[in-house]
A protein has these predicted regions:
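Catalytic nucleophile-loop/oxyanion-hole region of alpha/beta-hydrolase
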Residues: 45, 63-104, 239-243
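Short amphipathic alpha-helix adjacent to the substrate-entry channel of hydrolases
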Residues: 46-64
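Short beta-strand element of the alpha/beta-hydrolase
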Residues: 29-39
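The feature captures the conserved acid-bearing segment of alpha/beta-hydrolase catalytic domains
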Residues: 133-135, 140, 146-154, 164-206
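N-terminal cap/lid segment of alpha/beta-hydrolase-fold proteins
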Residues: 1-27
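Primarily recognizes the serine-hydrolase "nucleophile elbow" in alpha/beta-hydrolase
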Residues: 91-155
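C-terminal catalytic histidine-bearing segment of alpha/beta-hydrolase fold enzymes
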Residues: 205-208, 213-261
Length: 261
């Protein structure tokens, strides 16, 4: 595995808006997976060594993104940073890593807060459009344990009870409001666990059923349920048979299925 570290994607925030690349050794045509870390929009960072399995075991390149968080940031700064990072990374790969097929094999995903951010980029087109992209410029999205309603720390910013279920412009599910053309829906892989945060499995099911209600092409959408795991437990859990992280196995299977079509 090769690395390119500490690349600034927003010069106005050089201490925070950084991305690390984890690349396969072989410079052959490969997918690129942009990963947004978790931490409740107030913690966490781009240093996610469990993602090493993707380039080392599956030949999938990874760009691990750090973004502004509370208390310095406010809604929707972190969504805007995420969109800026995707556009920057796509252009950076075109110019510096031309063997990565970002035209046909570009994936975006995240876990927990990062799953919320990936959902916002997937369903709320205005964020990527600001940077000259649209959600379908991304081949597929991996939403791992994200909150499809207003994120609990955005509720806290508003002075509200963080347990409230609210749906407005800060909720990914808000934007599921029409029946799309199948070609306008990117592939999706949605992950959640049995012992997730209270109400997270139910909200995940609501997201899935709302897409079905609006006649999304459900054959393009996968759901993965992890019995026995807590919130994002599949990130650090490894398969005892081969020692590969469960999240990476799931992500790689999804990416390989989509790119083989």
């Amino acid at each position: 595995m090769k690395t390119i570290l500490n690349v600034v994607y927003r010069p106005e925030y050089p201490e925070t808006c950084l991305v690390d690349f984890y690349l396969p050794d072989a410079e052959a045509s490969a997918p690129l997976f942009i990963y947004l870390h978790g931490g409740g929009l107030e913690a966490g960072n781009r240093h996610c060594d469990f993602l090493y399995d993707l380039p080392e075991k599956y030949g999938i390149a990874v760009a691990s993104v750090e973004y502004r968080m509370y208390p310095e940031a406010h809604d929707p700064d972190f969504v805007d940073d995420s969109a800026a990072s995707v556009a920057f990374i796509r252009n950076y790969a075109r110019e510096n890593l031309p063997y990565l097929d970002v035209e046909h094999m570009l994936f975006v995903g995240g876990s927990s807060a990062g799953g919320y951010l990936s959902m916002m980029l997937c369903f709320a087109p205005q964020y990527l459009e600001k940077y000259g992209m649209k959600p379908t410029d991304v081949t597929g999205y991996i939403h791992d344990a994200g909150q499809p309603t207003v994120h609990f720390n955005i509720l806290r910013e508003r002075g509200q009870d963080t347990r409230l279920v609210r749906i407005d412009e800060s909720a990914p599910i808000w934007y599921i409001d029409h029946t799309p053309e199948p070609a306008d829906v990117p592939h999706m892989c949605i992950l959640y666990s049995e012992n997730d945060i209270t109400n997270r499995p139910e909200q995940t099911a609501l997201l899935y059923r709302t897409m079905a209600h609006f006649e999304y092409p459900m054959e393009k959408i996968e759901m993965h349920y992890f019995p026995g795991y807590g919130h994002c437990g599949q990130l650090l859990a490894v398969d005892p048979e081969d020692g590969i992280h469960v999240f990476c196995k799931t992500a790689a299977a999804f990416i390989n299925t989509v790119t083989s079509h």
